[in-house]
């Protein structure tokens, strides 16, 4: 679903969850602040529906409501997994700083496991060539994605996964 000549960053991890459960947990950005440091997420619209708006704000005091780097996104494609096919959610980054796409892919691996792949094809808005800023951002994004997937897996292993609509 990406348009760059360079392959996007894609990191996968196996989860001991059925694909539907992994999808509910990882495709929903309202969970992401638990795994991504210094980040808060605000949403507008119906969860995991095309057109859903998400703003992730990152910075030293972002979780306390302070300003930070805003990553505005719109969900442009959503297809949940089935017992036999991969699910995909594609978020288009709308600026003002970050452009491109982020995807969450969840593929079933039997009844009780799934492979989650988080894809980032992100570059900076502005005068510099997207190919250059993709390369600059790649190590930071790779670290963020690896950490988020590791923390999510640790949460699942501990049996403490939370849901946004629960108290």
Go through the PLM ranges and name each one.
Residues 6-14, 53, 70, 101, ...:
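Intrinsic-disorder/low-complexity, polar/charged segments enriched in Ser/Thr/Lys/Arg/Asp/Glu/Gln
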Residues 24-31, 37, 142, 146, ...:
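Short, intrinsically disordered, mixed-charge
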């Amino acid at each position: 679903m990406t348009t760059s000549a360079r392959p996007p960053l894609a990191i996968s991890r196996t989860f001991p969850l059925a694909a539907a459960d992994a999808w509910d947990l990882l495709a929903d950005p309202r969970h992401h602040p638990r795994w991504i440091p210094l980040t808060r997420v605000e949403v507008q619209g119906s969860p995991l529906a095309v057109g859903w708006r998400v703003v992730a704000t990152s910075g030293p005091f972002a979780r306390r409501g302070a300003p930070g780097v805003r990553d505005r996104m719109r969900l442009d494609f959503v297809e949940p997994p089935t017992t036999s096919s991969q699910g995909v959610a594609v978020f288009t980054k709308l600026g003002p700083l970050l452009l491109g796409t982020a995807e969450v892919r969840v593929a079933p691996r039997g009844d009780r496991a799934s492979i989650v792949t988080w894809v980032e094809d992100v570059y900076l808005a502005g005068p510099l060539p997207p190919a250059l800023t993709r390369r600059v951002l790649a190590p930071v994004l790779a670290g963020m994605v690896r950490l988020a997937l590791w923390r999510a897996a640790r949460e699942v292993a501990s049996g403490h996964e939370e849901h946004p609509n629960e108290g």
